[in-house]
A protein has these predicted regions:
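Phosphate-coordination loops involved in phosphoryl transfer and adenosine-cofactor binding
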Residues: 13-16, 104, 156
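NAD(P)+-binding Rossmann beta1-loop-alpha1 motif at the extreme N-terminus of oxidoreductases
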Residues: 2-68, 72
Length: 304
């Protein structure tokens, strides 16, 4: 079932990386690794994508026979697809792993929600005996698909990690391995959190922004915006262009947290609407000043 590799010996990054799913994120992992001289094995259900990726990026197919050659395996697909792949290949991952020596490929995902994926992945890893760490690269564009992937997509980007509930020594070992394995991709900052905290915060920082942008362009006035719009319109509508299948799955998997954020936003917008309907300039000015003050404080905190 292939050879067992020890990620710890490959200082500076992996020698071989496996990628499951060659969309924007998976394709960017593949291109980034290939550009750094890392051998890339991959699998994607679309034969045309595999053919395109084989031209200078992917060296071969990732399967049960070859996954043991990898130092890291990146699951870059939708939540249910990640879980399904792990369930199908759990035994092969176990066969490629020596838990006594902490050897074998470390598996990470790139899914935008962590709760549903990490719960099942940690369970499978514990039952079968392989290593999994939840991960979420905070990078992307409004486009999707391998054609839009870039080798430099993750340069300077944050990477959020969700380790399993294991003893501190093993947790530090796994986190260290992941950081070493993604080094060639140029991530700028690493954060460690729990799956529940990740999903609570990401509902605000990412999912809500997509909902707001997507809803904003549904105004009938959007049909006549040309010639009247500049940076504000462009910034607010950038992520209205999205992958509905992927984002609906992510949002449903984080439904409670996202619904909370939407309801809170509706309440805030209601205050602005009341001020306008009442022609209450002082109240409106206070609302605007409050938002400005909060944003400045957040920016100052981030700068320090």
């Amino acid at each position: 079932m292939g050879t067992v590799r020890n990620a710890r010996v490959n200082q500076g990054g992996p020698k071989c990386a496996g990628i499951v799913g060659l969309g924007l994120i998976g394709g960017s992992f593949a291109r980034g690794y290939a550009q750094a001289g890392v051998r890339v094995l991959a699998w994607d259900p679309d034969d045309d994508v595999m053919t395109a990726a084989s031209m200078g990026t992917v060296a071969g197919e990732l399967n049960d026979e070859t996954l043991g050659e990898c130092d890291i395996i990146v699951l870059a697909c939708y939540p249910e697809a990640c879980i399904e792949w792990l369930e199908t290949h759990a035994q092969a991952l176990a066969d490629a792993t020596d838990t006594e020596a902490i050897m074998g490929p470390v598996v990470i995902d790139t899914v935008g929600v962590k709760g549903i994926v990490c719960e099942r992945a940690f369970e499978l890893a514990r039952e079968h005996g392989f290593y999994f760490v939840g991960a979420h690269p905070m990078a992307g564009t409004q486009f999707s698909g391998y054609a839009h992937s870039r080798a430099d997509l993750f340069q300077g980007a944050p990477l959020v990690l969700v380790p399993p509930a294991v003893d501190d020594a093993l947790k530090l070992e796994l986190l260290g391995q992941v950081r070493e394995m993604v080094r060639p991709l140029g991530f700028g900052k690493f954060s460690v959190t729990s799956a529940s905290e990740h999903d609570r915060v990401i509902a605000f920082t990412s999912q809500l922004a997509h909902v707001v942008s997507n809803a904003y362009v549904k105004s009938p006035t959007a049909q006549v915006h040309h010639g009247f719009s500049a940076g504000s319109y462009r910034d607010l509508t950038r992520v209205a262009h999205l992958n509905p299948q992927m984002w609906s799955e992510l949002m449903i998997d984080d439904a409670d947290a996202l619904a909370f954020e939407i309801d809170h936003l509706i309440d805030s917008l209601g205050a602005y609407s009341r001020a306008l309907k009442d022609r209450d300039q002082r109240y409106l000015e206070n609302l605007l000043a409050e938002g400005d003050r909060i944003k400045r404080a957040l920016d100052d905190e981030a700068a320090h």
